[in-house]
UniProtKB/Swiss-Prot annotation:
It comes from Mycoplasma pneumoniae (strain ATCC 29342 / M129 / Subtype 1). It comes from the Bacteria. Belongs to the MG185/MG260 family. This is Uncharacterized protein MPN_146. Residues 165-183, 213-233 have a biased composition (Polar residues). Residues 162-183, 196-239 are annotated as: Disordered.
Length: 265
């Protein structure tokens, strides 16, 4: 994204003879970016401005905050000319009339699919190319182990005889979900169970602390906190208070086979 200057409603930046690129990248990505700019600066035309990195702390959120601050105080001396961030920062520039279209830049090497986000930027009245993709973000999938355990364990078909404890977990519904027995799924299911056990143990310890501080002390059953199965059950019981009873429905987990591969993308 580029910042402009000079027009009505905007402010002029001091011409310091260089292009400042704001970046919040760290680690290897920061090193690679600097190497690319070093190569550009060594090969650029004599009269072209060199590019210099302005480091911003706080990742992309820090970049957004820094941009808003510099615009609000009309920073003319240390403000940057470009920023590596998401497209919503173009809207921020647009509110101060500081957006700059890349009309003279050759973007023919970019797929239109990667540039189409420019048509969906709020606050920008004039259509144009205001930002170009320079890197890929990493998609991260985070699994809440204890919650997933409650859902799957409630939906799971019980092995062998149904004990009173298992019956209470199924909330009156006989589960039909099965866990696939391939190695990857088995290992994942063990991790999910361990997450539930850890959560259950933490919950029981907190319950004990609360009970000691309470005037109406509730006697906990001895030994229940020391069983790993009890810990997982305690976790399920607490999560059930927020999520409610599991209900088996068509199109849901009824007859479903849980596999670790479902999380692959």
């Amino acid at each position: 994204m580029l910042a402009s200057c000079g027009a009505k409603g905007r402010f002029d930046q001091v011409d310091d003879g260089k292009i400042k690129l704001a970046s919040s990248l760290t680690g290897k990505r920061d090193v690679i970016l600097q190497e690319v700019l070093n190569k550009y600066n060594s090969r650029k035309a004599k009269d072209d401005y060199p590019i210099e990195i302005t480091k911003i702390a706080g990742s992309y959120d820090g970049g957004r905050s820094d941009l808003q601050t510099r615009l609000s105080v009309k920073d003319k001396t240390t403000f940057y000319n470009m920023i590596l961030n998401y497209s919503d920062t173009i809207s921020t520039l647009g509110r101060s009339n500081m957006e700059l279209p890349l009309d003279s830049v050759d973007v023919s090497q970019f797929s239109e699919n990667f540039l189409s986000f420019n048509d969906r930027i709020s606050g920008i009245s004039r259509k144009g190319i205001y930002g170009i993709p320079v890197s890929m973000s990493t998609d991260i999938l985070v699994i809440n182990g204890p919650v997933l355990h409650y859902i799957l364990n409630s939906a799971k078909k019980k092995d062998g005889a149904v004990t009173k404890k298992n019956a209470s977990n199924s909330n009156g519904n006989e589960g039909t979900l099965t866990v696939n027995n391939d190695q990857q799924t088995t290992e994942l299911w063990k991790k999910i169970e361990e997450a539930a056990k850890t959560n259950g143990k933490t919950t029981q310890e907190q319950t004990k602390r609360d009970a000691k501080q309470s005037t109406s002390l509730i006697q906990l059953k001895e030994g229940s906190a020391n069983t790993t199965e009890g810990n997982a059950s305690e976790s399920d019981k607490e999560i059930k208070k927020s999520w409610g009873n599991y209900q088996e429905v068509d199109g849901g987990l009824k007859g479903y086979t849980f596999k670790a591969s479902v999380f692959e993308n």
